[in-house]
C-alpha cells in the first residue's frame, strides 16, 4: 500500500514538460514511494528517482537533433527512424549516465507500461537494475510504432506503452496507491482525435491484428482516461499538473527553442501549484525534504 503515487504520461519530446515539473519537485524535496511511467514518462521517472536534476532536459535539448537519435539515415541503416539502441546504450550510459547508487538508495517502486504486440494489451513491468546496458524495458516502453521495430522481451515483441495505457492512473490504484499526483503533457481541454491512415497501419502491423486494433482505438481509451483523471481530482483522489495552454508540440519535435519553452512551462506550472500540491501531499502523509532551491 502506498499513500500516494506519481503517474507520468509520455508524449515523446513533449515530455520535456514533465522534465520541468519533476525538476521543480526535486528542487522542493518532493519524492514518492511509487512512480509509474509510460514511454518518455518512464525515462523521466528514472532520472527523477535517481535525483538526476536536469538530465532529461539536457538529453532533449542536446540530442533531439542528433542523427544518431532519429533520422532517415537510421531508417536506411537499421530499419528504425528512432535509434533505441543508441538512445538506451551510448547516450544513457556514456554521454548522460544515470546515478545508479542514488537510484538504488531511493527505494522507490517503479512501474513501466509496455504494449504486447501479440495481445494488443498493456503490460506492467517493474525494472530494478539499470546496470544492464540497453535498458530493454524502458526501450520497449518508448518503442514508437512505425518509427521502431519494437523490442523483444522474452518471447514476445513489445511497443510503446502509450498505445494501450497512456495515463495509467487506474493501475496506480490497482498497485495500492491511495492517492496520486498525475503529470499530463496535454492541456486540460485536449481531446485526442481518431488516427488517419488506417489502411497503412493495418498493412504495417498485419502480423499483429490486435495491436492494429489498439492503435486505431487509442483515441477512445485516451479520452476516457482523461475524463477519469479529472474526475479523480474532483473527488480529491488525485492532483493533476497539466500545461496551462496547448503546447503544439509534435511527438518528435526537434526545435530546441520550443522544447526549452515547454520545459520552462512545466517548471513554472509546478511552482505555481506548489503550495496546493504540498497541502495535498501532507494529507497523503508524503514526506517533503527541505527545498534545495527557492
Regions found by a protein language model. Give the residues of each.
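Patatin-like phospholipase
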Residues: 1-38, 46-285, 289
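Short "domain-exit" segments at the C-terminal end of structured domains
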Residues: 290-294
Amino acid at each position: 500500500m502506498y499513500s500516494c503515487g506519481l503517474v507520468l504520461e509520455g508524449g515523446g519530446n513533449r515530455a520535456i514538460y514533465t522534465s520541468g515539473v519533476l525538476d521543480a519537485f526535486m528542487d522542493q524535496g518532493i519524492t514518492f514511494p511509487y512512480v509509474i511511467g509510460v514511454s518518455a514518462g518512464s525515462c523521466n521517472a528514472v532520472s527523477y528517482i535517481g535525483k538526476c536534476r536536469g538530465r532529461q532536459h539536457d538529453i532533449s535539448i542536446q540530442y533531439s537533433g542528433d542523427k544518431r537519435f532519429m533520422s532517415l539515415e537510421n531508417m536506411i541503416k537499421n530499419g528504425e527512424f528512432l535509434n533505441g539502441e543508441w538512445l538506451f546504450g551510448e547516450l544513457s550510459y556514456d554521454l548522460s549516465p544515470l546515478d545508479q547508487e542514488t537510484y538504488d538508495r531511493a527505494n522507490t517502486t517503479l512501474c513501466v507500461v509496455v504494449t504486447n504486440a501479440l495481445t494488443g494489451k498493456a503490460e506492467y513491468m517493474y525494472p530494478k537494475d539499470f546496470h544492464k546496458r540497453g535498458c530493454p524495458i524502458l526501450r520497449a516502453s518508448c518503442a514508437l510504432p512505425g518509427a521502431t521495430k519494437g523490442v523483444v522481451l522474452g518471447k514476445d515483441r513489445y511497443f510503446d506503452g502509450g498505445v494501450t495505457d497512456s495515463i495509467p492512473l487506474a493501475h496506480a490504484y490497482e498497485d495500492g496507491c491511495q492517492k496520486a499526483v498525475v503529470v499530463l503533457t496535454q492541456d486540460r481541454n485536449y481531446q485526442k482525435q481518431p488516427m488517419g491512415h488506417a489502411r497503412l497501419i493495418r498493412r504495417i502491423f498485419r502480423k499483429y491484428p490486435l495491436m492494429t486494433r489498439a492503435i486505431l482505438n487509442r483515441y477512445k481509451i485516451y479520452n476516457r482516461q482523461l475524463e477519469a483523471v479529472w474526475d479523480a481530482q474532483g473527488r480529491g483522489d488525485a492532483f493533476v499538473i497539466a500545461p496551462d495552454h496547448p503546447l503544439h508540440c509534435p511527438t518528435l519535435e526537434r526545435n530546441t527553442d520550443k522544447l526549452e519553452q515547454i520545459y520552462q512551462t512545466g517548471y513554472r506550472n509546478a511552482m505555481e501549484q506548489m503550495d496546493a500540491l504540498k497541502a495535498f501531499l501532507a494529507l497523503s502523509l508524503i514526506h517533503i525534504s527541505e527545498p534545495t532551491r527557492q
